[in-house]
């Protein structure tokens, strides 16, 4: 019976490669819209295994439910602060309002791709986008990558930058720290090179020294255990 290599295990998608979504606390979306204003008060700040940024537990004004409501927050938002979503919100840190109501040059985050979808862009810890212009029902935003992107003016966005900035500034220092960090995500770590494996574990494994021992190019229709290296490569080597 053949030996299943790590590439095939990843394709099967076992627990090691699946995101721990059963631990996620909530799907964070805007509570209001371009036509409806919602107010809430931050009552606590918690950690969510789904992301690297802290999230806020909020109490929606006029809502009697005891169910916890969560919101994505910006840097500087604290317990007891009022957050507002909708057209009546003012342009202050933490509030969410239509892009048409946000002045040019203001930093924003958690931008909707389409009005009412709850927020899709600029949601990672410490990131921000900047309003750069408005034209014919569209609002231009400079994304964290530096590229401009145009959105419908009715899309909601949160004023400020996402909380949790500076997270990657602290060095890992120890492999054990990195191990536990990677265990929280759908990533297998460390990633071992094929030439460093035994011959049974990878087509490039084994031998007296580390080398593939065969051409790295492989056909598109190769069997799963062989399909490693340069798959269906048009060319290999350095360009001249």
Curated annotation (Swiss-Prot):
Family annotation (Pfam families) = Ribosomal_L2, Ribosomal_L2_C
Q: Which UniProt keywords apply?
A: Ribonucleoprotein, Ribosomal protein, RNA-binding, rRNA-binding
Region: Disordered; residue ranges are: 1-20, 204-240
Q: Which Gene3D superfamilies match?
A: 2.30.30.30, Nucleic acid-binding proteins, Ribosomal protein L2, domain 3
Can the keyword Hydrolase be found in this entry's annotation? Answer: no
> From the Swiss-Prot or TrEMBL record, what is one GO molecular function term?
structural constituent of ribosome
Q: How does it assemble?
A: Part of the 50S ribosomal subunit. Forms a bridge to the 30S subunit in the 70S ribosome.
The cross-references to NCBIfam families, in alphabetical order and at most eight, read: PRK09612.1
PANTHER family in the cross-refs: LARGE RIBOSOMAL SUBUNIT PROTEIN UL2, RIBOSOMAL PROTEIN L2
List the protein's name.
Large ribosomal subunit protein uL2
Lineage runs: Archaea, Methanobacteriati, Methanobacteriota, Stenosarchaea group, Methanomicrobia
- The gene from which this protein is expressed is rpl2
């Amino acid at each position: 019976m053949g030996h299943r290599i790590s590439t095939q295990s990843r394709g099967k998608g076992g627990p090691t490669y699946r995101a721990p979504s059963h631990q996620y606390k909530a799907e964070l979306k805007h509570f209001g819209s371009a036509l409806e204003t919602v107010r809430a008060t931050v009552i606590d700040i918690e950690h969510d295994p789904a992301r690297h940024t802290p999230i806020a537990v909020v109490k929606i004004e006029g809502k009697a439910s005891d169910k916890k409501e969560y919101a994505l927050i910006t840097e500087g938002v604290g317990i007891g602060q009022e957050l507002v979503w909708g057209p009546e919100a003012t342009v202050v840190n933490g509030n969410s309002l239509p892009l048409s109501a946000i002045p040019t040059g203001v930093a924003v985050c958690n931008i909707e791709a389409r009005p009412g979808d709850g927020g899709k862009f600029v949601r990672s810890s410490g990131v921000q986008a900047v309003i750069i212009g408005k034209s014919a029902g569209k609002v231009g935003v400079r994304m964290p990558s530096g590229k401009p992107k145009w959105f419908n003016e009715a899309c909601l966005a949160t004023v400020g930058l996402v909380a949790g900035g500076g997270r990657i500034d602290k060095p890992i220092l120890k492999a054990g720290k990195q191990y536990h960090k990677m265990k929280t995500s759908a990533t297998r770590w460390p990633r071992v090179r094929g030439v460093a494996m035994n011959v049974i574990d990878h087509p490039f494994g084994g031998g007296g020294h580390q080398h593939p021992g065969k051409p790295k190019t492989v056909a598109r229709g190769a069997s799963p255990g062989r399909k490693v290296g340069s798959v269906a490569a048009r060319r290999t080597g350095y360009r001249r």
